[in-house]
């Protein structure tokens, strides 16, 4: 029997003598995480030159729609925040406020050297040395600026991380 949601290995693990033997929570976690990972809606928080590469990722060449990734402008409609660029002390409060407005579960991708650890401006008095000091980060994308392929790979890594998550 072929199942659309479970792979053959998972189906073989859950199947025993024609019955589906599992804890109800395991199966619901699997289905929920499968659905969540296939419909990521990132919100852009472009702060510097990395935002240009983020826009490049949204273009037709990379076609994020085929992965279920659609950019949203509102934090209430998105579940992923992409922090792209240098985070200053003045923008840190706005970043946290926007993050708090997102619905749970919410994920953060830190894109570029500046968002990861301050980058070129690390020693400046007005730069936060990594957005992980303000919001919890799930995936770090290195580079200055990282390529569109690197951001796409980071999104795919986030999808895999969501699939492996246990909800309860």
Swiss-Prot record:
It is an enzyme of class 7 (translocase). Keywords: 4Fe-4S, Cell inner membrane, Cell membrane, Iron, Iron-sulfur, Membrane, Metal-binding, NAD, Quinone, Translocase, Transport, Ubiquinone. GO terms for cellular component: plasma membrane; respiratory chain complex I. Its main location: membrane. It is a peripheral membrane protein. It comes from the Bacteria. InterPro entries: NADH_UbQ_OxRdtase-like_20kDa, NADH_UQ_OxRdtase_20Kd_su. NDH-1 shuttles electrons from NADH, via FMN and iron-sulfur (Fe-S) centers, to quinones in the respiratory chain. The immediate electron acceptor for the enzyme in this species is believed to be ubiquinone. Couples the redox reaction to proton translocation (for every two electrons transferred, four hydrogen ions are translocated across the cytoplasmic membrane), and thus conserves the redox energy in a proton gradient. Belongs to the complex I 20 kDa subunit family. NCBIfam families: nuoB_fam (TIGR01957), PRK06411.1 (NF005012). This is NADH-quinone oxidoreductase subunit B. It comes from Wolbachia sp. subsp. Drosophila simulans (strain wRi). The gene is nuoB.
